[in-house]
Amino acid sequence: MVFYKYSGSGNDFLIVQSFKKKDFSNLAKQVCHRHEGFGADGLVVVLPSKDYDYEWDFYNSDGSKAGMCGNASRCVGLFAYQHAIASKNHVFLAGKREISICIEEPNIIESNLGNYKILDVIPALRCEKFFSSGSVLEHIPTFYLIDTGVPHLVGFVENKEGLNSLNTLELRALRHEFNANINIAFIENKETIFLQTYERGVEDFTLACGTGMAAVFIAARIFYNTPKKAALIPKSNESLELSLKNDGIFYKGAVRYIGMSVLGMRVFENGCF
């Protein structure tokens, strides 16, 4: 079985094609493992679709399924075009969400992540029990729970240096309390936002998270009156352009093809596929 590795703003993914829906959880855990596998943030299984150019099943590196992943959507869009599965402008199904892809340059991909939902506005009092004394999170007055395909908790710090002082244990506690990815951001100016994401399924900081950037972008737009277009800069320091239009959140940036490989017999013998 051939798989292809792509990277989008620091997130890397293994992409494979399958003509039948199966449970790929064990396969995802093995091939995504950084030391015992090939290493990736997630596995994308591209499947045929009657109503769309294709559909996907997305697996986090721990084998759990997710309905949506922003960076993976851009990576799979380029993969589908390069492998003649779809044209430059196409639509695929991610869980129950339609994702439109536009390839503007050889490696600049824009995806429409669709609409969002504000799930909750959470005062700091509901979160402070998770914070240690002197934590940078103590100074965040309000957190926002936003669904951009998957749920994200968003909070804004007062200065950029605060992003370098985040406590993994505190973010992990918030992740389990709200069953959401955790995003801490700093608005440098109205059009530039820095952020760090603690991602569930990865259970650590990731270099970037597309749906997380979308959630931060929306929270900044609604609650801090930032414009409808902004540059978001995640841990990878790669700038991504996000914009809000009538039909959804648009997310644009570079995608890199890294290489391809073949799954060896050991994977099949262990019953992963």
Curated annotation (Swiss-Prot):
GO MF annotation, one = diaminopimelate epimerase activity
Q: Which Pfam families match?
A: DAP_epimerase (PF01678)
Q: In this UniProt entry, which residues are annotated as the site Could be important to modulate the pK values of the two catalytic cysteine residues?
A: H152, E199
Task: Provide the active-site residues from the annotation.
Answer: C69, C209
Q: What pathway annotation does it carry?
A: Amino-acid biosynthesis; L-lysine biosynthesis via DAP pathway; DL-2,6-diaminopimelate from LL-2,6-diaminopimelate: step 1/1
Which family, according to UniProt?
Belongs to the diaminopimelate epimerase family.
Q: Provide the protein name.
A: Diaminopimelate epimerase
Q: Which gene encodes it?
A: dapF
